[in-house]
From Swiss-Prot:
Cofactor binding description: Binds 1 heme group covalently.
Organism the protein comes from: Mesostigma viride
Organismal lineage: Eukaryota, Viridiplantae, Streptophyta, Mesostigmatophyceae, Mesostigmatales
Encoding gene per record: petA
Sorted UniProt keywords: Chloroplast, Electron transport, Heme, Iron, Membrane, Metal-binding, Photosynthesis, Plastid, Signal, Thylakoid, Transmembrane, Transmembrane helix, Transport
Protein name: Cytochrome f
Residue numbers binding heme: Y32, C52, C55, H56
Membrane topology: Single-pass membrane protein
Cofactor(s) the protein requires to work: heme
Single GO MF annotation: iron ion binding
GO cellular component, one term: chloroplast thylakoid membrane
Span of the signal peptide: 1-31
Subunit relationships: The 4 large subunits of the cytochrome b6-f complex are cytochrome b6, subunit IV (17 kDa polypeptide, petD), cytochrome f and the Rieske protein, while the 4 small subunits are PetG, PetL, PetM and PetN. The complex functions as a dimer.
Xref: PROSITE patterns: CYTF
GO biological process: photosynthesis
Recorded family membership: Belongs to the cytochrome f family.
């Protein structure tokens, strides 16, 4: 119960910071896990796609490394790798350029969860540093999220995972389990409400001739003359205009470049929850097999000596 209240308190604090940031700073469409948490009961759609792809439209690679097999009730590492060029900068919410952030969601089998601090080995703690992981929600301790965090120092994220013990955890078995990961680098192109961020390409809403372009503090106002009148398209600062006054455009034609340098990727892997009794039997079998081969060799040599001795007579 105490852990539950602690978890809820953490979520309230995060939500409070997000509200304050939304009021006093421009919405940045970063890798805030709370966006997915507030809009989706599960981070994975029925199609298998992770919902983060709804906001991060570009596809980028991601990799995950886990042990081939783990023993019950043990702590192991799940290493998520998010490769990208650290020299590249992204468009921030205010239109300026800045470093990329990263975020990730790790979907574990039921029963697997974030390892408690007192169970994490010191060597693993040094790899985790001060990173903060949290469950996707109170009902899904097996789904972990992190981000946004600075990407230049966190292109590899080590998740400390505690495996279940089938002897104590009902519904878990000594079998092979799937693990899924989704990770992004950089800001998203779409907000959860469907509106665009300033980290994507903008298109002309109508066909016509551009009669005026006014640059304001936070946006461009582009006047397009049509046969039915003038339509003004608003483009936030960030993407660069690729049209000029006097140009003719058609509906859907790009009027800016695509400033996005990031993207999202997902990957699946597997881990075996190994029964320690099977390992003991396997070791015993290997020992017996080895001893059997040794005895066979000794018996063969003994037989050869007897044969040689008989031949001498």
């Amino acid at each position: 119960m105490q852990n539950m209240f602690s978890f809820l308190s953490n979520k309230k604090i995060i939500a409070l910071f997000l509200i304050i940031g939304t009021i006093f700073m421009p919405l940045s469409s970063e890798a805030y896990p709370i966006f997915a948490q507030q809009n989706y009961a599960s981070p994975r759609e029925a199609t298998g796609r992770i919902v983060c792809a709804n906001c991060h439209l570009a596809k980028k690679p991601v990799d995950i490394e886990v042990p081939q097999a783990v023993l019950p009730d043990t702590v192991f590492e799940a290493v998520v790798k998010i490769p990208y060029d650290t020299q590249v900068q992204q468009v921030l919410g205010n239109g300026k350029k800045g470093p990329l952030n990263v975020g990730a969601v790790l979907i574990l089998p039921e029963g697997f969860k974030l390892a408690p601090q007192d169970r994490i080995p010191e060597e693993m703690k040094s790899k985790i540093s001060n990173l903060y992981f949290q469950p996707y929600n109170a009902a899904n301790e097996n789904i972990l999220v992190i981000g946004p965090i600075p990407g230049d120092k966190n292109r590899e994220i080590v998740f400390p995972i505690l495996s279940p013990d089938p002897a104590k955890d009902k519904g878990t078995y000594f079998i092979k389990y799937p693990i899924s990961v989704g990770a992004n680098r950089g800001r998203g192109q779409v907000y959860p409400d469907g509106s665009k961020s300033n980290n994507t390409v903008y298109n002309a809403s109508v066909s016509g001739t551009i009669t005026d372009i006014i640059k304001e503090k936070k946006a461009y106002k582009i006047s397009i003359e049509t046969k039915d009148g003038t339509v003004v398209d608003t483009v936030p600062v960030g993407p660069e205009l690729i049209v000029a006054k006097g140009d003719t455009v058609v509906t859907g034609q790009p009027i800016t470049d695509n400033p996005n340098v990031g993207g999202f990727g997902q990957m699946d892997t597997e881990v075996v929850l190994q029964n320690p009794v099977r390992i003991k039997w396997l070791i015993a079998f290997l020992i017996l097999s080895t001893l059997g081969q040794v005895f066979l060799v000794l018996k063969k040599k003994q037989f050869e000596r007897v044969q040689i001795a008989e031949s001498n007579f």
